[in-house]
Structures are given as C-alpha cells and as structure tokens.
C-alpha cells in the first residue's frame, strides 16, 4: 500500500486521560471504547491449572478481576510515569479486543493536557512512530478539542478530569498560551481524600482494587455543596452504599467534604488555586477586550465536572471573583465526559487536518523538533 493511501485512511483518535482512555475512529460520534487507564498484575500465586491466564490485564478484564490484581495507573497528573505500561495499554487499544486494526495503517490524533513537560510529548511521538510505526501523528491540547465538540470557536474551557484541571481561553479559534492555567488537583485527588474521610467514618479501603471501589462511591454518592459551612452545621443525611461484597456502608459528610477539595485544595495542604480561581485567573490573563465575551462563554469538560451541584457552586464562586456587571454563562454539555474525544473525532475528519499532522517522513528527518513545530 502506498504511504499516501495509508495517510488517507480514517485516523484513530485516542484521548489519553489519566483515569480513563477513550479510543475510536475519526468521524464516529462517540468513542468506540472507554476503559480505565490502568494495568493489573496478579498479586497471588497461581495454584490451579486452567486458572486465569496471563501476567498482565488491561481494560474490561482488569476491571472484572481487580480483586486479584495489583492495579497501577501509568499516568499521574496528566504525565506518563511508566512508559512500558503505557505502551502496553496503547497496544491493547489496537488489539483484537478493541479497534482490531494495525497501527501502521492509520494516522493518530493523541490528546495531551496543556503545559505538560515537552519530554512527555517527545516520548509519546517516539513510541507511536518507532514502536507502532504510525504513518502520521498529531498531538492536540484537550481543552481546545472540547470546544470543537460544541461547534464554538470562542470560549473558555474548564476541563477537570482525573489527573489535571485546566482552563484554556480560546478566541475565534486561537488559543492563548499565555492565559492558560493548570493545576494538578482533580478527580484522583478527590478519591484519595474520600478514602481518608471514609477511614475516619470507620470504613477502611487500603488495596489498589479497593481504591477503585472508593472511586465508584465518589461517582455515585458525592455532590458539591452550594454552602459547605451550612451543611457542616446541619446533620447530613447519610446515604447507604452497597459494597461489592454485599455489605452496606453509610456515607455521611464525606459526600460533600471530598469534592470540596476541588475548590479548596488547602484541605490537603496543597497550595494550588481552587478550580474557580483557575478559571477566573485564566480569563483575567487574557486581553481586556476579550474578557466580557469569555465570561459569557464558559464551557465545562471532563469527568470531575459531573458532580451533582458542580455548575451552581462554580457559578456562585465565579460571581464573587468577577467584575460586578459582567454576565456569566456556564454551559455543561451532557456528553462532557467524552467532549475531548468528540472534538478530536471532528478535527481529524476535516480535510485541513492533513496539513496539521507530522508524517513519519518529517519525524525521521527532524526528530522530536517536528512534533513541537506542529503542536501548540
């Protein structure tokens, strides 16, 4: 097959989140596959023949057998810490269980958090070009893709996932690098804090598989309080949560105390800005003429914005920091868990996308410099 024909193939879009990886083909409306971005290794000795085969589990199989496995996330706060495991997960994306395709036959759009170390991007390019032999690669910023998904060209995206929270102002399709704000406080920190709070309430979760149970409790039971001081004073109604072993757990004030961390990182001694400050500071770092428009076009993206009460709380906090007469409008698209991937799918389907990517030939000639030249 001629290299041009291969480049004309449908691109593969991989939204490489710290917590969940979403993958599929450009042009599709939603990602074909979504699974936790972790690998599991058996932590006990195999004593029976015909027992679960394999030394490494990824995707649905790792979820299904997680009680037997030591779970490890190769990404922490948007940066890959273990490249071997990350490579295995990407290999699995192409396997017969997932996309069922050969990596060398499709260009790739890969997403990345803004203000990531450039070494992270260089290594990702090296893996895709040298290990997976992809014909072309484009590494795109997550928040900009979320805006593509809504069909807008102007707005400020507040994207909070599992590893990173960032705010990126975009005006008429131009992202403003100097205005980007990022903090490494996100969903996984909320899960860790919830585990600590549940321990104080009498429930102990200590293994890596039990941490996944805590994550599920967070997703199903936690909410953001509009007035945490008031809720602290009231006797919070406890919610019963059924654990995988059938026993029940009563979750009390931890339900709103844990996600409060997103707005008050100092609860765990972190000196980062709260999520509302990240958003407002990003707008204030933009040109004065653009601020009013940006305040009226705030868009939420990522799994950590799905907490019940998140939008109302964010609006009340932003109002305190914004100029008095400014109109504030926050949009929370229903598909915001996937909006980065959907934006990637739209971008990779456009004809102009072919001008944006780095081909294997360019990479062989210029190395990692080619990647930086074509990504912002």
Curated annotation (Swiss-Prot):
GO CC aspect terms: centrosome; cytoplasm; dynactin complex
Domain of life: Eukaryota
Protein name according to UniProt: Beta-centractin
Subcellular location: Cytoplasm, Cytoskeleton; Cytoplasm, Cytoskeleton, Microtubule organizing center, Centrosome
Signal sequence bounds: none
GO molecular function, one term: ATP binding
Main location: cytoplasm
Record has Cytoplasm as a keyword: yes
Family: Belongs to the actin family. ARP1 subfamily.
């Amino acid at each position: 097959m001629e290299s041009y024909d291969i480049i004309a193939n449908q691109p593969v879009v991989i939204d490489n989140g710290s917590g969940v990886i979403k993958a599929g083909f450009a042009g599709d409306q939603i990602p074909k596959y979504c699974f936790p971005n972790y690998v599991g290794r058996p932590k006990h000795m195999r004593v029976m023949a015909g027992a679960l085969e394999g030394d490494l589990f990824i995707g649905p199989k790792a979820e299904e057998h997680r009680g037997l496995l030591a779970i490890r996330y190769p990404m922490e706060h948007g940066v890959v810490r273990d490249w071997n495991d990350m490579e295995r997960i990407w290999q699995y994306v192409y396997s017969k269980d997932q996309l069922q395709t050969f990596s060398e036959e499709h260009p790739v759009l890969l997403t990345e958090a803004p203000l990531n170390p450039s070494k992270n991007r260089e290594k990702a390019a090296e893996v895709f070009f040298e290990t997976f032999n992809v014909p072309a690669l484009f590494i795109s910023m997550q928040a900009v893709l979320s805006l593509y998904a809504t069909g807008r060209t102007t707005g400020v995206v507040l994207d909070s996932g599992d590893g990173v929270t960032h705010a990126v102002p975009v005006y008429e399709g131009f992202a403003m690098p100097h205005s980007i704000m990022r903090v490494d406080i996100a969903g996984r920190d909320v899960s860790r804090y919830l585990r600590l709070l549940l321990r104080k309430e009498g429930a102990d979760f200590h293994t890596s598989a039990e941490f996944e149970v805590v994550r599920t409790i967070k997703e199903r039971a936690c909410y953001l309080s509009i007035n945490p001081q008031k809720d602290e004073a009231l006797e919070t109604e406890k919610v019963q949560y059924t654990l995988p072993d059938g026993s029940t757990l009563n979750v009390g004030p931890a339900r709103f105390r844990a996600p409060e961390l997103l707005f008050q990182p100092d609860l765990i001694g972190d000196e980062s800005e709260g999520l509302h400050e990240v958003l407002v500071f990003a707008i204030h770092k933009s040109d004065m003429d653009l601020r009013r428009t940006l305040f009226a076009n705030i868009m939420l993206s990522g799994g950590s914005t799905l907490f019940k009460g998140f939008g109302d709380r964010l609006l009340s906090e932003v109002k305190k920091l914004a100029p008095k007469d400014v109109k504030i409008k926050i949009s929370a698209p229903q598909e915001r868990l996937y909006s980065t991937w959907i934006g990637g799918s739209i971008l990779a389907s456009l004809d102009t996308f072919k001008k944006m990517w780095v081909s294997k030939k360019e990479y062989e000639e210029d190395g990692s410099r080619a990647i930086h030249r074509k990504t912002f």
